[in-house]
Amino acid sequence: MSKDSDYKRAEKHLSSIDNKWSSLVKKVGPCTLTPHPEHAPYEGIIRAITSQKLSDAATNSIINKFCTQCSDNDEFPTPKQIMETDVETLHECGFSKLKSQEIHIVAEAALNKQIPSKSEIEKMSEEELMESLSKIKGVKRWTIEMYSIFTLGRLDIMPADDSTLKNEAKEFFGLSSKPQTEEVEKLTKPCKPYRTIAAWYLWQIPKLHRKGQ
């Protein structure tokens, strides 16, 4: 089944839950989430690490500098090239000290075959993927969820611990305070099996505000 048909089914399902979801889907329009399954596993994980607590624009800027400074052809650096790049150079690209260290750890894990191959990952459930990748130091649940959404394109991921999503969930569900992770999971349970698309729509709420909606 194609991505477009999956998204249409997801939009129809979300719209059928209640008026709030129906209104949000209508205001935002069709889902334009674009995962990149062509990325190697280590690349997808590093991109997820880079994006934490940053805007899309800031993330893209850092990745572009990273590719320019750390590879020979402006493509995403290989694990070997990353290991040959010192923390100071990574910091110049825009990575924090902690993220620089985590990126080195992921690159080393890739070189040591500690990261499953694409074909192996495709056969894994989300629980199996969590168990496998969380063995890599610094790779936590949020990073794996972002990898599952933006690289693998899995449709039923709810990153309930994401701070931005919690803020949007507070507004969307009319809560008096920022929800706990468990509450987000409970509130979005009706969105199964399309929780990734539900998360994407919640992330669009600030854009609606900027448009005055």
Swiss-Prot record:
GO terms for biological process: base-excision repair, AP site formation. DNA binds at residues 53-54, 61, 91, 94, 96-97, 99, 102, 137-138, 140, 143, 163-164. Its main location: nucleus. Keywords: DNA damage, DNA repair, Nucleus. It comes from the Eukaryota. One of its GO terms (cellular component) is nucleus. Disulfide bonds: none annotated. GO terms for molecular function: alkylated DNA binding; catalytic activity; DNA binding; DNA-(abasic site) binding. CDD domains: ENDO3c. PROSITE patterns: ALKYLBASE_DNA_GLYCOS (PS00516). The keyword DNA damage applies. Induction: Transcription is strongly induced following exposure to the alkylating agent methyl methanesulfonate (MMS) and oxidizing H(2)O(2). It holds the Pfam family HhH-GPD. It is found in: Nucleus. Signal peptide: none annotated. InterPro entries: Alkylbase_DNA_Glycosylase/TA (IPR051912), Alkylbase_DNA_glycsylse_CS (IPR000035), DNA_glycosylase (IPR011257), HhH-GPD_domain (IPR003265). PANTHER family: DNA-3-METHYLADENINE GLYCOSYLASE. Alkylbase DNA glycosidase-like protein that shows no DNA glycosylase activity for alkylated bases. The molecular role of mag2 appears to be abasic (AP) site recognition and protection, while possibly facilitating damage signaling by structurally sculpting the DNA substrate. Stimulates AP site binding to mismatch repair protein mutS. Belongs to the alkylbase DNA glycosidase AlkA family. This is Alkylbase DNA glycosidase-like protein mag2. The gene is mag2.
